[in-house]
A protein has these predicted regions:
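Feature recognizes metal-dependent phosphohydrolase scaffolds
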Residues: 1-410
Length: 410
């Protein structure tokens, strides 16, 4: 993804990860390949040399990615993602690939590292590159701090002050019921599916190093990124391979989960809230999909029960959406949505004294001011006060003996 948008500074400079092994490998293996389909996108100003090098890096790491994804799919048949095994569907003589049983011509047939007899096996050189890159990731202190923070503070969903927050979807069927997925011999749907996904993802970080459980969790983290019923993905497939190699646009389609149709219905939003033990007056705060406001799309769904928040971090979407994202503000009186207008950069805004314009839209006004005691934090404070009172009572009744200085060894 970072090579696609020429955003390698984040990896190399911010996280201190060495990409030289990948660059050296790519420049060697794809020396005479223009890598047309892999040229970086975006408005980053690059020299021709850097532009071509990043394109080659993009192709090299993509091939390795598809090989390793294929290994996961074969290792985890429960994911039911065999339709994403495409490297073994390439006909190297005819220059075609089978996608969902249909043969399509390919626009690029330069695969110097793929063995048609064993297409998902990394070459020795590829394995060496992956080992070095992995070592850099594992030994990046800042990256590990950020990953630790995500596991400590993050979750697949979160309930805060009566609001249900999640990134992607609660997988649904075309009839509007919660979709059922089977993992490790059990069926899950709705909240139970979200809880399962959260727990299994944690195995990939907290299970003992080198254990089967840790590998199991790490494989599942990949499923969460692009799996057919992943609550974090919400689409039928990630068709990156087809977009790069097949000109026929029909293969590029990524069918959205029925959730994206049903979340417009207030009754469905209320059923989702009920699934998570919340009243119908609560709100769902949803992310993941940019809202195309310039085409008239509204971020407010389901009769006001659901709000779609796109933070606008991906500049590439600004032209498509017509905005630079939203900020949801929840105060003691109101819940409001701030719509930000596109701007080039914060640095330019400060340098040229430009206004960063935002439009305020009040979604809901409370009849009475919400106090700290009315919030989840207030409940935590109440419990602490109760515990302290219990402690004082226990001390006053002599259940906790007074400690004297001579009892301690200093």
């Amino acid at each position: 993804i970072q090579t696609r948008y020429a955003n390698l500074d984040t990896i190399e400079e911010d996280y201190g990860i060495n990409l030289l092994p990948l660059a050296t490998f790519a420049m060697d293996k794809y020396a005479g390949d223009p890598c047309e389909q892999f040229k970086p996108k975006g408005d980053e100003v690059l020299s021709d040399k850097d532009f071509n090098m990043i394109a080659k890096m993009h192709k090299a790491i993509s091939i390795m990615q598809w090989k390793m994804e294929g290994q996961i799919i074969k290792r985890r048949p429960e994911f039911r993602m065999e339709n994403r095994l495409l490297l073994d569907k390439i006909d190297f003589e005819k220059g075609t690939v089978l996608v969902d049983g249909v043969e399509y011509p390919m626009n690029d047939m330069n695969f110097p590292t793929i063995d048609p007899k064993d297409p998902y096996k990394l070459t020795e050189e590829e394995q060496e590159v992956m080992d070095k890159v992995k070592s850099s990731f594992v030994n990046s202190e800042k990256l590990q701090q950020h990953v630790e923070f995500l596991y400590a503070k993050g979750s697949v969903y979160h309930i805060e002050n009566g609001n249900l927050l999640y990134h992607g979807v609660v997988p649904m069927t075309a009839k509007g019921s919660f979709a059922v997925e089977r993992f490790e011999g059990r069926r899950y749907s709705g909240r139970a599916l979200m809880d399962y996904c959260d727990a299994r993802a944690r195995r990939g970080y907290y299970a003992p190093e080198g254990s089967a459980e840790r590998q199991n969790g790490q494989d599942f983290l990949w499923y969460l990124w692009c799996g057919r019923l992943s609550p974090l993905f919400g689409r039928s497939a990630m068709t990156t391979f087809e977009r790069l190699y097949v000109e026929d646009a029909s293969t590029h389609t990524e069918v959205k989960d029925p959730y994206y149709t049903w979340y417009n219905e207030e009754a469905v939003c209320r059923s989702i809230l009920a699934e998570f033990g919340l009243p119908g007056t609560s709100h769902i705060v949803n992310g993941h999909v940019p809202v195309q406001e310039k085409k008239g799309e509204s971020p407010i769904k389901g009769g006001g029960r659901l709000v779609v928040i796109d933070g606008g971090f991906c500049r590439a979407y600004h032209e498509k959406t017509g905005i630079a994202g939203y900020t949801l503000v929840y105060s003691s009186r109101t819940m409001s949505l701030r719509t930000h207008q596109p701007f080039e950069s914060a640095e330019k805004a400060v340098r040229e004294n430009l206004d960063i314009l935002s439009q305020k839209n009040i979604l809901e006004t409370e009849n009475h001011r919400i106090l700290v005691e009315d919030t989840d934090e207030g409940e935590v404070l109440r419990e602490r006060v109760h515990d302290l009172k219990q402690l004082v009572t226990a001390y006053q009744l002599g259940w906790i003996p007074e400690a004297r200085c001579e009892d301690h060894v200093w």
